[in-house]
Amino acid sequence: MNKVITDLDKALSGLKDGDTILVGGFGLCGIPEYAIDYIYKKGIKDLIVVSNNCGVDDFGLGILLEKKQIKKIIASYVGENKIFESQMLNGEIEVVLTPQGTLAENLRAGGAGIPAYYTPTGVGTLIAQGKESREFNGKEYILERAITGDYGLIKAYKSDTLGNLVFRKTARNFNPLCAMAAKICVAEVEEIVPAGELDPDEIHLPGIYVQHIYKGEKFEKRIEKTTTRSAK
């Protein structure tokens, strides 16, 4: 089955107000730039967003804050966005901060059909408040629940027409997990090759988890913070 699309509307026309979206990427690396821009332009609102972070003021998920399209975000780091800071302090957005490893495991559990699991991470901190806890072998654990979403919006380096994906470097971090835990996955890629061209050992995410593939013409790949040194 050829999963390649040339218009994101074909893949995202069913996305509606109040949906939960799982957005891949780490910082600004490996984010689905085109899907985020689509949501921004369509004005879809009251979204529940699950992502490692929330972009910056004018790029990535940060642009969805401009029109207050995000109702709730589950993330592990949100410190690079002034608009986000303002909305959080004013009670305009619900924020659930989650340890990075726990967030990854919540998504993995969702994709694997595991409803919940116990972890020692967060015991004795604010993270544990309101969560069930149990002791195993003399050590305390808290119950974490799996995360699933209506749409998984991800970015990969290469795909074949069947949706088998190859990621590069840091982009492999949360993108596969967001695909696995979503009902519908839309993958943005830089290159598409015919089915059978990818070596099976090269594939990072099987196409069974991907419903749509969209080839971006030009990804900005912005650097969050650029540090240079003086010429010697």
Swiss-Prot record:
InterPro entries: 3-oxoacid_CoA-transf_A (IPR012792), CoA_trans_fam_I (IPR004165), CoA_transf_BS (IPR004163), NagB/RpiA_transferase-like (IPR037171). Its EC number is 2.8.3.5. It is an enzyme of class 2 (transferase). Gene3D superfamilies: Glutaconate Coenzyme A-transferase (3.40.1080.10). It comes from the Bacteria. One of its GO terms (molecular function) is succinyl-CoA:3-oxo-acid CoA-transferase activity. Keywords: Transferase. CoA binds at G24, G25, F26, G27, L28, C29, G30. It catalyses: a 3-oxo acid + succinyl-CoA = a 3-oxoacyl-CoA + succinate. Belongs to the 3-oxoacid CoA-transferase subunit A family. Heterodimer of a subunit A and a subunit B. This is Succinyl-CoA:3-ketoacid coenzyme A transferase subunit A. It comes from Helicobacter pylori (strain J99 / ATCC 700824) (Campylobacter pylori J99). The gene is scoA.
